[in-house]
Amino acid sequence: MKVSLFITCLADVFYPDVGRHTVELLERYGCEVEFPEQQTCCGQPAYNSGYHRDTKKVAKHMIETFARAEYVVSPSGSCVAMFHEYEELLKDEPVWQERAKKLVAKTYELSQFLVNVLKVKEVHSSLQAKATYHTSCHMTRLLGETQSPFDLLEKVEGLQLEELPNRETCCGFGGTFSVKMTPISEQMVDEKVRHIEETGADVLIGADCGCLMNIGGRIQRKGKPIKMMHLAEVLNHQERTREE
């Protein structure tokens, strides 16, 4: 099975190890992974800021980039959710709208792909930690994915997963929201950090780098000893340990 990796901006620039873990996971389950180098941002920051004309150009570029892919997989529910906006964005151009629909049909967030396409039953990973999981807004509300990450995490050996209070609430990142509405964003992330602390977790797991960056930054400034881990890193943890 051939898979094209959609790495996303944040993983590419700030969290390259997330890309490595994603590739290693996919290869472990028999996938042949390719990385189309011409890929760019999905266009979400421009789209959320109202620059829809510019976003259309990005959307068409990404549609072209992954046109020949069998499957497209990304370690970000938020960016995959943005692909779902392309169809509406290009509604006045039927040919491009149809191409956008085809892209969406073959694009998956990592945990979705592992559970729903590869039908993974065992993850063969271990993490001796008390952790909690942050459900990102875009992945939950726009992509509609709520269960796959938990299906995988419950199979990680040694992982004690605690329920995060009010897990459905936003962490305050929201892409450009955290820049445009900084005071509100800060209050939201402070509330999220309080809920994380209530669980007594040593590790916060998430499937979107933006959320992890926002929450992790706040936790670091508060001097709290809570580690941020992307879902891909957790699922690949034992493999990395063996290599080291």
Curated annotation (Swiss-Prot):
GO molecular function, one term: oxidoreductase activity
A single BP term in Gene Ontology: lactate metabolic process
InterPro entries found in the cross-reference section: Cys_rich_dom, LutA
Coiled coil: none
Secretion signal, residue range per the UniProt entry: none
GO cellular component, one term: cytosol
HAMAP family per the UniProt record, alphabetical: LutA (MF_02105)
Protein family per UniProt: Belongs to the LutA/YkgE family.
PANTHER family per record: LACTATE UTILIZATION PROTEIN A, UNCHARACTERIZED PROTEIN YKGE
Function according to Swiss-Prot or TrEMBL: Is involved in L-lactate degradation and allows cells to grow with lactate as the sole carbon source.
Name of this chain's protein: Lactate utilization protein A
Native source species: Halalkalibacterium halodurans (strain ATCC BAA-125 / DSM 18197 / FERM 7344 / JCM 9153 / C-125) (Bacillus halodurans)
